[in-house]
């Protein structure tokens, strides 16, 4: 019988696809401009690449282990990206225009909000969004 994954585990697989996809985009011709910026906005370095690869790999591991491990992944991811947004935003407050600062941070803002929302609401035992019991 095939293994059944809870909704939060499926979300973790989705985040794995997102992060591993961003990692792989670095190696697609035409995505990076002459200044090394992805889509002309996002500076991608080896450290950033490793961060995306690590976040995607940890998402797969959390999803495969259990719903509880996937939930821990989302809490840690939310905290990590919240710290990232605050430090980047504050560090670049007087270096780049406010609008560009917000736009550059928008993917990470959406990720930490989604991660906290998933960790706090998806697949909780006894909730309406729970499709399987948490392991």
Where in this protein do the model-derived segments appear?
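Membrane-interface extramembranous regions
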Residues: 1-135
């Amino acid at each position: 019988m095939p293994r059944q994954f809870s909704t939060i585990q499926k979300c973790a697989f989705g985040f794995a696809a997102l992060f591993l996809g961003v990692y792989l985009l670095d190696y697609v011709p035409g995505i990076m401009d002459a200044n090394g910026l992805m889509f002309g906005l996002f500076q991608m370095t080896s450290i950033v690449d490793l961060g995306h690869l690590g976040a995607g790999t940890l998402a797969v591991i959390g999803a495969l282990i259990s719903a509880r491990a996937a939930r821990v992944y989302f809490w840690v991811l939310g905290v990590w990206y919240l710290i990232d947004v605050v430090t980047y935003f504050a560090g670049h407050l007087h270096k780049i225009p406010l609008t560009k600062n917000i736009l550059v941070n928008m993917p990470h803002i959406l990720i930490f909000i989604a991660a906290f929302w998933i960790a706090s609401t998806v697949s909780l035992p006894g909730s309406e969004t729970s499709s399987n019991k948490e392991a």
